[in-house]
Amino acid sequence: MATQTVEDSSRARPRQTSVGSLLKPLNSEYGKVAPGWGTTPLMGIAMALFAIFLSIILEIYNSSILLDGISMN
């Protein structure tokens, strides 16, 4: 068969590094959700501004906005 069983004793354990020890407290909140809406409205505003930016770029690309002093080929 293509499946291979690995015994627990033969597995290599992950090394503990100083960077890992420094970053471990930052990962302690993993999976926890803050109550309420949190930063959802801020993310919605950022998405709306990004959509407006993309539509402006698309309109310039399609030459549907004429800019004074800039010649388009």
Swiss-Prot record:
Renumbered to this chain, region (Disordered) spans: 1-20
Query: Chief subcellular site?
Result: plastid
Please report the PTM annotation for this entry: Phosphorylation is a light-dependent reaction catalyzed by a membrane-bound kinase; phosphorylation occurs on Thr residue(s) in the N-terminus of the protein.
- MF terms in GO: phosphate ion binding
UniProt keywords (A-Z) are:
Chloroplast, Membrane, Phosphoprotein, Photosynthesis, Photosystem II, Plastid, Thylakoid, Transmembrane, Transmembrane helix
**Locations listed in the record:** Plastid, Chloroplast thylakoid membrane
Q: InterPro entries given for it?
A: PSII_PsbH (IPR001056), PSII_PsbH_sf (IPR036863)
Positions bearing Phosphothreonine:
T3, T5
Q: A Pfam family this protein belongs to?
A: PsbH
Cellular component annotations (GO), alphabetically ordered:
chloroplast thylakoid membrane; photosystem II
Gene Ontology BP terms: photosynthesis; protein stabilization
- Residues that span the membrane, as ranges: 41-61
- Keyword set includes Transmembrane helix: yes
Q: Where is the signal peptide?
A: none
Q: How does it sit in the membrane?
A: Single-pass membrane protein
**PANTHER family from the xrefs?**
PHOTOSYSTEM II REACTION CENTER PROTEIN H
Q: Which family does it belong to?
A: Belongs to the PsbH family.
* Protein purpose: One of the components of the core complex of photosystem II (PSII), required for its stability and/or assembly. PSII is a light-driven water:plastoquinone oxidoreductase that uses light energy to abstract electrons from H(2)O, generating O(2) and a proton gradient subsequently used for ATP formation. It consists of a core antenna complex that captures photons, and an electron transfer chain that converts photonic excitation into a charge separation.
Give the quaternary structure: PSII is composed of 1 copy each of membrane proteins PsbA, PsbB, PsbC, PsbD, PsbE, PsbF, PsbH, PsbI, PsbJ, PsbK, PsbL, PsbM, PsbT, PsbX, PsbY, PsbZ, Psb30/Ycf12, at least 3 peripheral proteins of the oxygen-evolving complex and a large number of cofactors. It forms dimeric complexes.
Q: Would you tell me the protein name for this molecule? A: Photosystem II reaction center protein H
